[in-house]
């Protein structure tokens, strides 16, 4: 859901986002957005609230909302009355934090820190270490948009692990309020005195404010007496100025038609990605072309025929890369993705697809073009994409990468690990060192130089089991027994529940992390093989 604004102003230490007509101002509080309308004559302006609400563990229960209400009462916050009878907005969850005394303490904050272990488990469906950060929105200053998430981003404060939200706990909602919470009322008093009122035309229609719906569901309107309204007053009908407008994504960029079937006679369009206005990211159809035909296109004895000199070099380069990384079908090399029943070139295609999808530089488009040239020359029919096969391949490599990175993050949380003699090969040791350094460089709050030989050895132990194709949980269990860090098993179990196709900010963050880890492992492997250091 998106709310647009024209300008910002600072008033009483609050950032207000003022709409184009200057009759409405938004402000952020504890992951939610409050909207205040300009008073008219003696009538106060419309007050509304947008954001995530917590509900229950199933489609028809309100366990989580009731838990928050109960905790608020036990902590003596009787004056806090969450809106509605069933849901509790995210900013009320803030009040369970012992460091927060009222909504005033979470003004201008997009997220909520949850220290309550029971509530954190409700939100993530997992036992977590204390401290998760739940983000309900972001302000896109370059677009002048306040974006409210349909699904929150939940991150562990200590490990930075990104969780998938429980499916029934959160929902996007909007509510009409009779007044603001008492702690916030003084912040908006006199706000519009400093904002010039626009001159209304004589034939002015009733004002409206568009709320752009970008998710699959429109925010649920909540009818209630409002936060801190002081008792259950008489219900009355209200007419809101807000109008929900559904945003429909364009199927593809302007001027781009879907990729033609392989037997199309137009040679210029037969090669996926050859159009001048190609989409910025790879498509599953392109991956399927490579997945289906790469072994024939690059491995056949006469695969080089009819190609330019540069294309011949590219074909040989891809064959060499696939062998250096993954070996051959008869003699697979110990590396990530070993448990996948794929050929080396298929693994390479999925590897580059995941990296390229996150806008990182990769030769995936060149690989697609080469395979397209082959299917064009030989009239090879490529069937419709097998989505389950592609999903299994992508998720397998995606989860392997995330599991390796998550294990490195968990190990780096410990300055001292038990010294043990853990035999690790030179390739695995190089991978382990590179991955730890990459993750350490991303942890800005932690000073550098904390990577020890034990960190390298134990991550190497994890990678050795993973590279042998024995599975992520086997690798986590083996490493947990060596180190005594049992949280590794839980963390990798969390990874196994993630998908490369998860929606929302959390899914995007996981894909970015996985692509980064794969990029690091690819770089160090190819660099070592180029210098003849691979063992």
UniProtKB/Swiss-Prot annotation:
Any keyword Protease?
Answer: no
Q: How does it assemble?
A: Interacts (via C-terminus) with UL16.
> What segment(s) does the record annotate as region Disordered?
251-279
Q: Which UniProt keywords apply?
A: Host cytoplasm, Host nucleus, Virion, Virion tegument
Role, per record: May participate in DNA packaging/capsid maturation events. Promotes efficient incorporation of tegument proteins UL46, UL49, and US3 into virions. May also play a role in capsid transport to the trans-Golgi network (TGN).
Species name: Human herpesvirus 1 (strain 17) (HHV-1)
Q: Where in the cell is it found?
A: Virion tegument; Host cytoplasm; Host nucleus
Q: What is this protein called?
A: Tegument protein UL21
Family (UniProt): Belongs to the alphaherpesvirinae UL21 protein family.
Gene Ontology cellular-component terms for this entry are: host cell cytoplasm; host cell nucleus; viral tegument
